[in-house]
């Protein structure tokens, strides 16, 4: 059974931005592999976009290099583990990564080598509650939100050393 949960985008401007990514990908010849449907009965006036899958996406294409922030998936082939890590780290962004493998050693290696703020192993978004720090690296976020790490941004640490004499 299908269990899809894809809500609307936040603004009309963002909807137009994502539609632009989709239109430019189609116009440039990137294969459209699948496109979902907007569910019946969604509220009128919502900024809904049908989930869309492209692939193979060329490595230099904007879908492979930019953050779309919409329901668009880019399938990018890779040769091996090292190539996958190199590909993931070659972007200017680093919010999070998802790795699917049964190999526990590979999970550990790749999670360590990924340049991003969060790594999900064999899941995506599971357990990402308020207790886990959230944030990216490079151009994807500043600092950490959620969890105890988020409080550090509001703190000024002061060290006081005092000598009381003999």
Q: What is the predicted role of each segment?
A:
Residues 38-41, 45-166:
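Conserved C-terminal structural/oligomerization subdomain of aldehyde/semialdehyde dehydrogenase
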Residues 9-19:
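Short beta-strand to alpha-helix junction loop
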Residues 29-38:
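Short secondary-structure junctions
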């Amino acid at each position: 059974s299908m269990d899809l949960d894809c809500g609307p985008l936040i603004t009309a401007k963002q909807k137009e931005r994502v539609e632009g990514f989709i239109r430019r990908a189609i116009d440039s010849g990137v294969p459209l592999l699948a496109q979902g449907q907007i569910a019946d009965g969604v509220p009128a006036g919502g900024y809904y976009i049908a989930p869309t899958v492209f692939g193979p996406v060329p490595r230099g294409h904007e879908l492979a290099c930019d953050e779309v922030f919409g329901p668009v998936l880019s399938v990018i082939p890779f040769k091996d583990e090292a190539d996958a890590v190199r590909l993931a780290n070659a972007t200017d962004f680093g919010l999070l990564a998802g790795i699917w493998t049964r190999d526990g050693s590979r999970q550990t290696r790749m999670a360590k080598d990924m340049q991003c703020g969060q790594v999900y192993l064999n899941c995506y978004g599971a357990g990402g509650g308020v207790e886990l720090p959230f944030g990216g690296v490079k151009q994807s976020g500043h600092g950490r939100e959620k969890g105890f790490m988020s409080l550090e941004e509001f703190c000024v640490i002061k060290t006081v050393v005092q000598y009381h004499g003999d």
